[in-house]
Amino acid sequence: TVANPLSAMQGQVPGLRITRSSAAPGEEGWGVSIRGSVSKNKVEPLLIIDGVPASGVSEMAQLNADDIETINFLKDASAAIYGAKAAGGVILVTTKRPDAGKTRVEYSGSVTRKIVGLQPRMMSMDEWTDGVLQARLNDGYGEDDNWVRYARLAKAMKGSWINLHGGNNPDEDPIPGGFRGVADFVFHDMNWTDVLWGNATSTQHNLSVSGGSEKSTYRLSLGYLNDQGTLQWGNNSNERYNVRLFNSFKINNRISLETNMSASRQHQVAPTQIGSILGSSIPQPGLPVSTIDGKPYAWGGIHTPNWSAELGGDNKLVVTTMNVNEILKVNILDGLD
């Protein structure tokens, strides 16, 4: 599944640098440079789709990759014909054209599995408690320090929990004074990157009908994309619908008319709290994903980020685009197109 044609070109074209700042579906933050990332005057390339300049390279995200016939890149002298806007180069996109003949129906579909790659290695419970102990003792705190006592308790109770109101309580007063505002303590060895992120699936379906005669040809295409995010909590996806119609009509031997119409509608959903989830520090490894009965867990004023994503609401963005391009071709002299 190719959600954005730019993703298919990464590393495929010499001199073309394509970057992205996020893996969020529909919000990848693509950046394109033809001249190179070290250019003094770095300018975004001019995107031209079927002869019509686009508002920016971001419009590539609205294109159905199955509709694209060719993509060409121009820079320096070859891009000069497009003027000052082409200072960063030109990306020429040509969509598919029909052939005269019998009606042709084509379908393509794909299912892609996203696999989370490199993740930062998080501290284990033992490493975290050792770090807390070393830091506090290095700063001159003694064994009666709240954090020193808490770290030693966490190391001793790793994989278990304490409930001050009963249940599993190894001591009448095991908790340091600075932590007594919390009734329960959990010391699970939790890797929060594995909790928050995981594999995801994307699906794509494309259907086209084309054909015509020597005088008139047509191509109608429909596309559907469902791109799921790797965040395992809350709603995080990009759903896109595409429709494109091309029709050429030969009025006479010298005059022809081309109609190129396209429309897309994109639905993006992301957790409202995703900014704080990504920007906040990962909780200490002892906190659990949920309570014993599967409800959100909080430790004092600390809320685990998975439930912020799950229950914090959604941000929804709907992007609708429509383009109509009419071209009247007049062949004034024989041999000139």
Task: Place the predicted regions along the sequence by residue.
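Outer-membrane beta-barrel channels and translocator barrels
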Residues: V2, A100, S202, S213-E214, ...
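Periplasmic plug
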Residues: E28-D76, S108, K114, R121, ...
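Residues on the lipid-exposed face of transmembrane beta-strands in outer-membrane beta-barrel proteins
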Residues: G36, T95, Y107, L207-S213, ...
